[in-house]
Amino acid sequence: MSIVVKNNIHWVGQRDWEVRDFHGTEYKTLRGSSYNSYLIREEKNVLIDTVDHKFSREFVQNLRNEIDLADIDYIVINHAEEDHAGALTELMAQIPDTPIYCTANAIDSINGHHHHPEWNFNVVKTGDTLDIGNGKQLIFVETPMLHWPDSMMTYLTGDAVLFSNDAFGQHYCDEHLFNDEVDQTELFEQCQRYYANILTPFSRLVTPKITEILGFNLPVDMIATSHGVVWRDNPTQIVELYLKWAADYQEDRITIFYDTMSNNTRMMADAIAQGIAETDPRVAVKIFNVARSDKNEILTNVFRSKGVLVGTSTMNNVMMPKIAGLVEEMTGLRFRNKRASAFGSHGWSGGAVDRLSTRLQDAGFEMSLSLKAKWRPDQDALKLCREHGREIARQWALAPLPQSTVNTVVKEETSATTTADLGPRMQCSVCQWIYDPAKGEPMQDVAPGTPWSEVPDNFLCPECSLGKDVFEELASEAK
């Protein structure tokens, strides 16, 4: 089924509701994706891109229902990756002599994937045009490393449509094609996720390339992407967002992520977050356990943040493998204008936190002091964690802190009145983990200030996973 994009332009792509992994398993496409291909029917008929290789047969059959394949005059390949040009082999088997217009780098990539050097390739460069009749032309603009060396965009005069390739896209599947037809919150979340996880390394190229395209002084009524929606309602809004995201983007936000073996590093993360919130209540703080969280959501939050705190237990003298992998990804994403601090617990040897600090510095983060704890943090260690959080809040503040937080000395022990109001702390009789009503248990949506009597019956001990019935009033507080 085709969809009219504008006048003689039809979408002939493929929706993929079920795909959950992209680029191997590195990008989680939680809302599916689409592979957008466009058929332009003027005096000359032009196909712009194909679809993912796994849909090759369906694509060619659907295309045959729209047009006699022999009537396709030109094929434009904006990008040679398999989710864009994957159906070329199936298509070219039917129309082997059809001219393919692409960049010089794309020829190498296409041959590397499809192994057909005999195809009728035609190299185009920025500013080259192709007349398709009825007073309309295609204008080509090379966009190397956004995000492959072969990438380019194609502009259709007359209709003022920019076929933008991966730029301005999102892995987002919906029955509706246009941006004004879909859920706006979902759409912009997926746009930012896409930019943060795929295009961030090339941010330094985004602004100059957009400036170059704007320099052609061509009107843009629509932006037709390779994935997700077509921008027809105020298409410049996504361009403006890209310019914003490319400019060393940050919000007043701190991301904390960690991995842990015995919940010791997790206790540190919670205490650090409390210290930050006490000192700067305006900052948004998000905490993630990497073993239980969507990696791409973590990286999107890092992209949005002014700083990141990374925690790891020590395992065989080095950091936990999932932390090491995520830090390696952050190195490749080349985040800018962000600060970092490492923390973690260890037993007899240690070593992971120092190694982590070095890796974060190598990744381009401006480093703050790290923090270590031996074995399970006791009350004194947790006090240090909260103070570390306060210091981080002060060092990383984007604006002067509220005067009340500057002048107030935060007390570590809750006042007698407050303690009495919240009731006693409770200790797991199996593993000795302590529930403190003043802190709550954020990982189970138990807010700070929740007395034990109001903790849900399905609550589980974070360490041993046993229920409320194994908890007893802490001996030191028993009356």
Curated annotation (Swiss-Prot):
An example Gene Ontology biological process: response to nitric oxide
Pathway info: Nitrogen metabolism; nitric oxide reduction
Annotated positions binding FMN: 260-264, 342-369
Domain of life: Bacteria
Positions annotated to bind Fe cation 3: C428, C431, C461, C464
Obligatory cofactor(s): Fe cation; FMN
Record Pfam families: Flavodoxin_1, ODP, Rubredoxin
Family stated for the protein in its record: In the N-terminal section; belongs to the zinc metallo-hydrolase group 3 family.
Protein name: Anaerobic nitric oxide reductase flavorubredoxin
Lineage, broadest ranks: Bacteria, Pseudomonadati, Pseudomonadota, Gammaproteobacteria, Enterobacterales
